[in-house]
Structure formats: C-alpha cells, structure tokens
A protein has these predicted regions:
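Hydrophobic helical membrane-anchoring modules
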Residues: 42, 86-88, 112-194
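Walker B catalytic motif
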Residues: 31
Length: 194
C-alpha cells in the first residue's frame, strides 16, 4: 500500500504508483472496476510478445460496455471513433483506463494531465502512438457501476480535460510525422468445460 503525497485524483495516484513500481510492467487499473481482471493474462501475453502498451477495449470485436450512463457510453464511443478518424489512432478505445505499460517506455514520457479523471489514460495512449510504441488490445466486457454507489464522473471538469487532450492529439498528429505503430489484438481466453 502506498501513500500518495501528490494529492487526490487518478493522475496523481498514477504518478505515485509509477514512481514506486519495481516490475517490468505497470498495470493501470481502477480498484473499483469489475470484470476486466480476466484480461490481465492476455495483456501479459501481448507485453511478452513485444508490446510497449496494451489497452483493454470495449469497442473492438468481443468487447462491450454494460451499465453506467447511456450518455457517457455514447459520448465515449463517438469520441473514440472521431479521434481515430482524425488522427489515425490505432487503438479502438484510447480512453479506457485499463492499460499495461512497459515501465522503461513509460519513463520516457512526461504525463501532464492533472485533473479530469481518467484523461491521463487518454493522454498516455496518444503519446504512445506518437512515439511509435508497439501497442496491443484485449477486448473486455466492462461492467460499469451496476452496484456499489454512484460514479464520480463529472462531465464539466472531466470533459474539459478530455477535450484538451483530444485537441492536442489532433494537432500533434498533423504536426509530427507518425511513427509506424501497429496494434496486436488477443481475444480473452474463455473457459471450455466440454
């Protein structure tokens, strides 16, 4: 258990965790998330096959989003599709907070997001692609707040931070020649009891 001296929020918690990470890979994951734990083995396989970043996806074949706000889900799906079209983003779900990153690669990036909930994960995906990292995706069924209290998502302040990184990513993708990056996808393993 770590003490976070940087203050509240996902970005500060993430920075503290990265500073104290000792392993080769860093798993970024919300402690109150359910379901995607099953994807960790597939994420590890992709990392071991050479990926620098593996992101879970709700929007590729085999992925789904259950629960949560319909408006939030629709905004997320539309924003990801628009961002992919505008920038050539290889990930189908750049905004998800469930990522595994090679620590040595992560240390080469400066994460700047300060507020905005999981916008730091979006920033990470953008900067990883611009740097030409090898990326992978694992489809998940994300179960969002079906129980356990209300989400802390606030469209106003969080939306501004996501918009900031959306616009920054579009501008950078037009300014900086894109380094080749490809996405490898693995379907999560299923239990076969036949």
């Amino acid at each position: 258990l770590l003490h976070n001296p940087d203050g509240r929020g996902v970005a500060n918690a993430l920075r503290t965790g990265i500073r104290h990470a000792a392993g080769e890979y860093v798993l970024i994951f919300a402690v109150d998330d359910t379901g995607p734990v099953l994807a960790i083995d597939e994420m590890l396989r992709l990392m071991e096959s050479g990926c620098d970043l593996v992101s879970c996806t709700r929007y590729a074949r085999g992925g789904r989003r259950l629960g949560g706000s319909r408006i939030g889900g629709l905004l997320s799906r539309i924003a990801n599709a628009m961002f992919r079209r505008a920038t050539g983003m290889k990930l189908t779900d750049a905004t998800t907070g469930i990522k595994m990153v090679r620590r040595s690669a992560l240390e080469s990036l400066r994460l700047e997001a300060t507020t905005g909930g999981w916008a730091v994960a979006f920033e990470l995906a953008i900067k990883a692609q611009l740097a030409g990292w090898r990326m992978g995706e694992v489809p998940i069924i994300s179960i969002d707040r079906l129980f356990g209290g209300a989400s802390t998502f606030a469209l106003g302040p969080w939306g501004k931070e996501y918009l900031r990184w959306f616009l920054w990513g579009v501008a950078q993708s037009r300014r900086i020649p894109r380094l080749p990056s490809a996405v490898m996808t693995r379907q999560p393993a299923t239990s076969d009891k036949s």
